[in-house]
Structures are given as structure tokens and as C-alpha cells.
């Protein structure tokens, strides 16, 4: 048991060092600024011009979208770029498990997603009448969403060996999630077929958690479903990323 605990500590510290390295190298690279920081704002402004929306709908949608693009943006750059340059091969050759490496990459995306979520939350709270009724639940929702979206980013970029290959599908998937996941349009107003699709997307559950926290209208059953769904998506995306990398590395 003691040996297991020590091994776990070493693996976690190694993953943190990998995340720190990614943060120093990739956080403020051009594509991350464009797709992580600016892209959510551009999409939101393009969709909201000429429309009126309740501020309680703006805050969760904007923050969830920034987390989706931010947490995944860094992995769409870091992993394919390192594979193209051969630095990822050296990392794999080190005495580190692939699971630990992916965990570190996921942490890197998590940190960037949290950073952008906080930035957009502050911006959204400057709107007239903006407030968050349950800050603790909102913070929990941000963290859980960033974990899920970071794991998604690693999963999407895992099969690709270069940035130009990884960016188009990653961007397409995220944009589809934004328009189908309740960021701009309430799920209840969608056709039944699109509602079914929406419930297969992690962003739907992220938006719902943040909306409940924003309004303070918390309903236990949907909240538990949201949390369970995001945890399930995180595990699936993480496991898929490890499996895809193992397959492509061999």
C-alpha cells in the first residue's frame, strides 16, 4: 500500500510538471489566443447582435463556451506540435506511463480553461443586472467542465501528428457543440431530434450546471445527472485519448 501511494505521488507530480511545461510554452501562443480567447467572443457577438437575451442565460453560455474552446485549444496545439517535432517521442521514451503523460496534458488544458472561464465570467458580471446566486456551485461547474473539455481536447488531437491536421476537426466539433448544446438556444425550444443530439454532448450538461448556479434555481435530479454525465464524459474521453495514442504510436 505504501509503495502504491508513493508511486501515485510520483505520477501526480510528473503530470503536474508536464502541465507546467505546457503552460509556459503554449498558453500564449497565437492559435491559443485566437481560438481560446477571441473565438468565443467572436461567435457570441456574431450570434447575439440584434437579439435580446436574459443575463442569466448569457453568463452560463459564455463561460461554458470559453471553457470549451480554452481547455481544448492548448491540446490541439501542444500534442500534435510535439509529435511533429519529435519531442513527444522523447517524452514517451522516458520512464513515464502514457496515462501519466495524458493526465499531465489534460491538466494543462484544465488550467487554461479555468483561466479563460474566469476572464469571461468577470466580463459577463460587468453586464447590468448580472449576478451569480450560488458561487460555490458555479465554481464547481467551471472546474468540472474544464476537466471534461480538456480531456475532449486531448482525445480529439490524439490521432493527429501535426497542428494543421488537428485544428480543423477540433474547431468543427466545438462549433457544432456550441450551437447544439444550449449555449445560445435553450434545449427545450429545439426540435425533438436536436434535443436528442444535445443530450449526447457534454457542453449541454456544463451549461445546465452553470445556469442552475447562476439563477439559484437548483433542482436535485437534473443537477445530479449533469455532474454524473460530465464525470462519465471525462473518463470516456481520457480513456479514448490513451487508447488512440497507443494505437498511433505503434
What label would you give each PLM region?
Residues 98-99, 103-171, 175, 220-231, ...:
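Alpha-helical transmembrane segments and their short interhelical loops
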Residues 30-31, 56, 99, 164, ...:
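Residues that define the loop-to-transmembrane-helix transition and helix capping
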Residues 48-49, 65, 81, 94, ...:
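Transmembrane helix-loop junction
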Residues 56-127, 172, 178:
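Hydrophobic alpha-helical transmembrane segments of multi-pass membrane transport proteins
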Residues 47-51, 157-204:
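Transmembrane helix segments
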Residues 3-10, 14-85, 113, 130-139, ...:
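Transmembrane helix-boundary elements of multi-pass transport/secretion proteins
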Residues 204-218:
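Short, membrane-exposed interhelical loops at transmembrane-helix boundaries
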